[in-house]
């Protein structure tokens, strides 16, 4: 009996030590209070499950070696791609451009040609045309690359250019491509394409890499032509039910996107020895000197001011979050926002409420049925706060809304890979183009207004009458959302 008591006491002491040490680690990471308390509760109330969850998903990328510490200095932007004279920037928007520059070093560039691509077919056609025109290099970076008909089309294009002696590089996110068979990438590597996976996740190194993903969608051709936006490379993006936007750019902004690619590539080369290109350095992207090939699609804007932002979890302050808050708090007439996933950080949530209550027409469009159970209900949990503040909320009904756009006052807009959620604002590597151009902003506004025709506007009176079960699902989903 005495031995049994000692054994029980020893187990309790060990349990207390483990709990105390785990809580201490979480506290020392200095997260937002809500996240800290959420993890503490999980670790205390669910000791085994909580430890496993924290081990896989909760560790801070800025601690230890989540990304090789020697590569962190690479994530400093290069201002040489910014060539816009101050007098060309709207005086009212200069504080925004300065804010973004101070957050990440990204400057405004002039002389950019822009084409808005409003569906997957238009994007794939423009991308195929661009890759086929390559003479020096093709840098392709994506979150999802499926081994389906679209993936095979892209593979054939890349292999054909590699056979011509063009420097072809593919950087894909390992988690985003979990469902893509390895033989697909081996085929590309055998054909001369330099292939690399961003933060590969394989046991036993799963622990610190699941939660910080490279969500960028970039393609750069010869430093003169580039693409950025929300579309990955898979058949479902060609479906009429999939609604998304992408941007084709020519000019200095294309070279800036090339610099982002080379930064990520060097990071992978230094930390990922599984890559087929681990020992092959990539040349630094230079501002373009030659004119890009013409686009068969109509070019919407020919001389736009563009500022490329590339927030990452290594940033001291998120350029995307800072820019979004500034846009909301400085809007005069309206801010329209589209995002497939809506779980805003406290600064963004507060800015949306403040803008709406100040008389600005703030509108939020999200899919009626996001592609995830918890994503759906956690997003819904913010609708009541939006409606109470005067934000107009729209649920996109036909298919899935995947666009990530912001437009304000017909004077600026943003298009890219970043969602308005915790992951994009804090955890992921993203890329967006902030466009200081009235014609392009007006075009994005018209897209939003056209999409409104396919939406159900949520009215506060009806929303307040939703079933109790829905409210419980929303509240519980929101409780766990800060964990990740």
Which functions belong to the PLM regions below?
Residues 1-322, 326, 330, 354, ...:
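N-terminal localization/anchoring segments of enzymes in phospholipid and broader phosphate metabolism
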Residues 338:
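Short alpha-helical functional segments enriched in proximate histidine and acidic residues
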Residues 346-349, 376-378, 408, 426:
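Histidine/acidic-residue-rich catalytic or RNA/ligand-binding cores of hydrolases
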Residues 393-397:
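Active-site donor-binding acidic/aromatic loop of nucleotide-activated sugar
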Residues 404:
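Catalytic-core elements of nucleic-acid end-processing and repair enzymes
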